[in-house]
A protein has these predicted regions:
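A glycine-rich beta-to-alpha transition motif near the start of alpha/beta enzyme domains, typified by
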Residues: 1-112
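Catalytic phosphate-donor-binding core of small-molecule kinases
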Residues: 103-127
Length: 127
């Protein structure tokens, strides 16, 4: 399988970012483990996959996979890299975008300085 990807770094975490908008990517636990392996694959802390939105009020859906292939709910450093990837690759011309994750919605903003601002939903402390 051949895929286009970017290797990105955010405050010490490294990511393989995959555009699932313009190419088909069949994700499996074994594929994630291979990509993340530092000797046999590309090597990364997490694999990030950008997908089409699942709701009309969202710009993109964002999936986060740990090195062991498990899918997780959130990664703030990864969200910053996703915003930069979306902007740099022309996937959106917007400065502010909304993305959904496994269980959350984030607002991302590309600042004039090139930095990325990530706005999380307020935490819920009740069980």
């Amino acid at each position: 399988m051949r895929i286009n990807f970017a290797k990105m770094n955010g405050v010490g975490n490294d990511f393989v970012v995959i555009d699932g908008i313009n190419q088909r990517f069949d994700i499996t636990k074994n594929t994630i483990k291979y990509l993340a392996h530092r000797n046999r694959g590309i090597g990364c802390d997490q694999v990030l996959l950008i997908e089409p939105p699942k709701r009309f009020d969202i710009d993109f859906h964002y999936r986060i996979f740990n090195r062991d292939g498990s899918e997780v709910e959130q990664c703030g450093n990864g969200a910053r890299c996703i915003a930069k990837f979306i902007h740099d690759n022309g996937l959106s011309g917007k400065k502010k975008i909304k993305i959904s994750t496994l269980n959350n919605t984030l607002e991302l903003e590309i600042l004039d300085s090139g930095d990325v601002l990530v706005m999380f939903e307020p935490p819920i402390f009740e069980p």
